[in-house]
Amino acid sequence: MEEGLLEIMTKDGGDMPAPLEVSTVPAVGDVISGEYNGGMKELMEHLKAQLQALFEDVRAMRGALDEQASHIQVLSDDVCANQRAIVSMCQIMTTAPRQGGLGVVGNKGNFPGARRDPETPSPGIGDSGLLGRDPEDEEDDDEEEKEMPSSATPTSHCELPESPCAGLLGGDGPLVEPLDLPDITLLQLEGEASL
């Protein structure tokens, strides 16, 4: 039928009809896919920026940790050095000879740096005292010392001081008068009889 109409129109000398313009409406799938692709692209760029910032933070934290580790290593080296020094000092102190004993023996009981006062002779002990006294006076003094007992002689350890209660215990009668108490045996017999 269309071919017939075209033939009639051509025979009459009419012009060919212009083709109908069809509006290009995008398909729903194309719209959805475009929006999806655009959203995913933006999301990927955002995630990429966040990951980059995270990597930068991790790199900074690693540098700080390395610095702290080096500082800790220095401190541990110092501690080890101090410990070795203390151990060596203890060994030296324990193995070193004691010099104080030698000083005491050399100075007859005095410390090495102590001053010694010059010994002054007591009066009467020197040569002048012995020469100035008469031998007869010395014999008289010896006799007087023998006759007079020395008050500074210590008493024997068996001689105990008199007790303050010695007079009371050495008296004629008892200290306390006996009370009139019933005999215990009589009380026991009376108790058995009552049973």
UniProtKB/Swiss-Prot annotation:
Superkingdom of source: Eukaryota
Coiled-coil regions listed in the entry: 39-68
Region feature Disordered, mapped onto this chain: 98-175
Keyword Coiled coil appears in the UniProt entry: yes
CC annotations in GO: cytoplasm
Composition skew (Acidic residues), residue ranges: 135-146
InterPro entries: DUF4677
Pfam annotation, one family: DUF4677
Protein name: Coiled-coil domain-containing protein 184
Keyword Coiled coil: yes
Organism of origin: Bos taurus
UniProt entry keywords in alphabetical sequence: Coiled coil
